[in-house]
Amino acid sequence: AVSGGPDSMAILDFLSNNHKVTAYYFDHGTHFGKESYSFLRDYCARKDIPFVASVLSAEKPKGKSLEEHWRDERYEKFHDYNLPIVTGHNLDDVIEWFLFSSLHGKGKIIPYRNRNVIRPFLSTPKKSLLDWCERKKVPFLTDPGNDDKKFMRSVIRHDMMPHAQVVNPGIQKTFKKLVEREYNLLY
């Protein structure tokens, strides 16, 4: 699954150089979706990677945030494909998701595997994926929604994470150990 961001572009680059893959893109119906769709379609055409896109419904049910609605729709589509789906979720996402789910009374970490969805970068810091893209000259887009504070994830990323890192400068190492222990990952 690709969004055009550095995480998914790093994994697409890595996998497409070593395996036969298809890039799956989910358009959330935002203005940025049109830009990322064109970017990904063109990138995949240049690299000879099959490209499949789906448009998700922007109408959310009552009682759900837009983020939750989009995530639920994406995963429903993932399961419809009934093929292994690899995502670029990384260690920074694990920490953000833990904080997000803790604020909602759940306190879970992102599962390494969920049915047909596999997340091999869960113990990899986002910076490593950015470094990969820079080293390999892999282009990527930055979604302006990542800075939009109407989304809880942006508040966590830009407001809470800097404070968490002051309280525990080794927070990434702490969560890396948690992920590796939880999923018995050997790196």
Task: Place the predicted regions along the sequence by residue.
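ATP/NTP-dependent adenylation/nucleotidyl-transfer catalytic domains that generate, transfer
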Residues: 150-187
